[in-house]
């Protein structure tokens, strides 16, 4: 028994450690058994790791010239940050401060130190763990990849200034793409550039990270802000890298300390305040002796390209997933070649759009054509002094810098340049400068010197060209910014030939060759203005949706520039301002005084001011005077805010002809004359087009809403016509008065607008009051009811949705939804309870007409609900988006909608669940979710488990997921009706959850290719559970009809258990079970075995030990319909044909494929 246990232990350890090659990064903790076996404490105390690779330096000596001279090959340690140019937070900066800067909900990758497996936590969870006392921590976790660019923490941390000049991200990647990045996380779909420059590493005492090489061969800068670290360093020689790759592929990382296998290894301790630079390719392991906070970053550079490519190839061979690799690696390589060609030859291979955005080639220079040289020199010097990242440590110049003052002229000729270099252009494209000249990016280039590249750059660029040329077409990853990659490769080859004779001494300039043109002298076009909507001009006024934004033509030049918008304040007079909080809306529930977290910082929905006013502190932008009397009736002395240009002026101060448009809903708001008159012609033309289109749409929508007796054209003052006026999107929500002569409205129309405005205010108040009544059911009479006059105004016209039987022409029994308009006249004539009028059959609305209702009608329908409809039991949508139900109609409505929902896809059902609470419940009906497929999901989150429980599926597919035992146990305890469970590719640690008495009576169980399942595990599944003795002495899998065991390491012992505990089994999958023999077939078909009579389908494909004798045993199966023996090398086709001839006495069988025997029905 001991050799068998040893074999099991070795195979399990091998599988567990192979996961750490990142083939499946989402497995559960229980699955990994390859714990660390070497003594880490002994590795910390021994003296054999005494090699000397690290160089201690001063910050002032770390510059570009140092890297040009040595290529950044040795690890560097700086005991203090003087001269490095780094910036760090205050010494008392804590992990809680990190959480506040990046967000408490930010997801971070956390590594379990014991298993070297990654999990995810929120920053809030991690902070709680970090602040937990050491003795109370159950596990050791380590944060190693919190990238914090584009967060509040970004500006608190600055990397070494020298890194800024050699980092490919800053100098090679198109800068407009980096500037367009807005996402703070490392979501690859939202990433605009390789986001690897700033990392925060947080470790607790005792954390250990095994030997590794940073992704993509990147170099690393590493500053110990708090705590300390211990590093083991292995140089990246060819032999060591080969050992490292074999160590990764061996699956023995937990057993072998790589530092013991190499000839030289150095252990070095970093203390608080140290800055560490790890060059490309260095293999290192890290230990944390005390709780530590580290800031660092990764960067690629041009002085060790061969090593960077070599590490990327190792990642390919070890199959590291994309999540843990350098993003956009080959895209970056293409941009490196393009930048070198451009900076040396002034010839760009970028597309025109990229040239415009990153090189600013179509921009004019401010003082290119005019201005004297002295003024330019003074201005240039001032700008150079303001440049925080200017190189002051290297006085040697490299003649490759561009003539930034002449960039405009040079760039305008670029589109006509050839794709390849020519001999006559070498004098213009190769530039140099005398040694000892101070480097000035603003001065003109010196054309009497040739560019010199270091031998590191020449060798790296050659390797880069060879690598990109050798890639297959689907792996070249040519970015969209490169116009012609073949021409770029050709230009680089010619360039390398011309620069092959570069003088190594002249190349040590201390100045990087590749630099972006400075943008401080470039004129940028102003962005087009966007018309600011009238209603959302201030925050408190949020009762109505904002109109569609429309671009505005640039206004004429004006000496008055007042774009400062003012946040409006409450009027403190309207009903919304004087009432208290409701305590039930989502804003109130968020308030701290009602027990919420207080994140939204919004006022109650019922307290949103209906007419916010300008604050007292605003002044006229022309005269500078405040509004002395806000109650004044003199319009000329009132401060007015333009809803387009946001200018606040007294109308009397404007010395302009013509008048503007007044917003009657919002006080002190108008469209000033200069903004109104400018677009008057365009708006008039647009209004005519929209009115004509809207009339056609309304005619189509309202036609089926009329009853048979109504005329097609309603009277001018009928409720239907009022409905059209209310829904007219051409007129803004806030009606404005046209005060231009000859175009003013009549008194009747003004009264109509006033009446409609008052009615809309009443509708809002009524809707909010009814919401309060419904929320507080224990006090139904707590709110004052609306008067009969107000209800009469509301009943003028509104829409309801009811359910009706189809017309007589449609011979069916289903119930369909119907849209209906209730008019004031019909509402007054109907008794109470009210019966909704039926439409004539000829005018029954079709489905297309129902969909034609726009969002405006839907909003009015929600706002203009009527209490009497609820009393009558009519089914319709109320103001909260839920269904009013009464008696048996509730059940009827549910069944009607269920008949519709069952035709929807899963995605469409999820969309319907967002409509209202009632639809949410209906769409969770288990009849709609009989089968749920979560196969190959990267992570099974608790929300997904809760969703499964709500839907109570019959079939659940969790194949190839990282579900844990705890999660599966929680599921099976709450899914009593589960019949089909698919767990292919899962681990035994999860499948073992089925060995309990709470396991449902399954019909189908799929365990194909599950990890760690052998005969003992199958025994635990099939034997009666022992967790509740005396409850039931039968197997929980006794009702199984389909059992799939493909790819498992099982023997005849499993088959005996199947015969004993599965009397109803009809389909059995034993494919690719290598230990099965002819005797296995004999067991399945022996006299007295249940499978002899119950089996109908048997799959034994890929079982190489089966011979023709198996077919002799399989003849005993009584009701076989399919036998799959494909891939069984020792079974001949002739034997299969004889087998078919013997079976075809009673039924017909055929050999449909090679060794696939099927019954002909």
Swiss-Prot record:
Q: List the coiled-coil residues.
A: none
Keywords for this protein: ADP-ribosylation, Allosteric enzyme, Biological rhythms, Chromatin regulator, Chromosome, Dioxygenase, DNA-binding, Iron, Isopeptide bond, Leucine-rich repeat, Metal-binding, Nucleus, Oxidoreductase, Phosphoprotein, Repeat, Repressor, Transcription, Transcription regulation, Ubl conjugation, Ubl conjugation pathway, Zinc, Zinc-finger
Quick one: a GO cellular component term? chromatin
Carrying ADP-ribosylarginine, the residues are 1019
One GO molecular function term of this record is: histone H3K36 demethylase activity
- Name the CDD domains for this protein: CTD_KDM2A, F-box_FBXL11, PHD_KDM2A
Task performed by this protein: Histone demethylase that specifically demethylates 'Lys-36' of histone H3, thereby playing a central role in histone code. Preferentially demethylates dimethylated H3 'Lys-36' residue while it has weak or no activity for mono- and tri-methylated H3 'Lys-36'. May also recognize and bind to some phosphorylated proteins and promote their ubiquitination and degradation. Required to maintain the heterochromatic state. Associates with centromeres and represses transcription of small non-coding RNAs that are encoded by the clusters of satellite repeats at the centromere.
How does the entry describe the domains?
The JmjC domain mediates demethylation activity and is required for satellite silencing. The CXXC zinc finger preferentially recognizes nonmethylated CpG DNA, and binding is blocked when the CpG DNA is methylated. It is essential for its ability to repress the transcriptional activator activity of CLOCK-BMAL1 heterodimer.
Q: What name does this protein carry?
A: Lysine-specific demethylase 2A
Q: What is the lineage of its organism?
A: Eukaryota, Metazoa, Chordata, Craniata, Vertebrata
The record's gene field reads Kdm2a
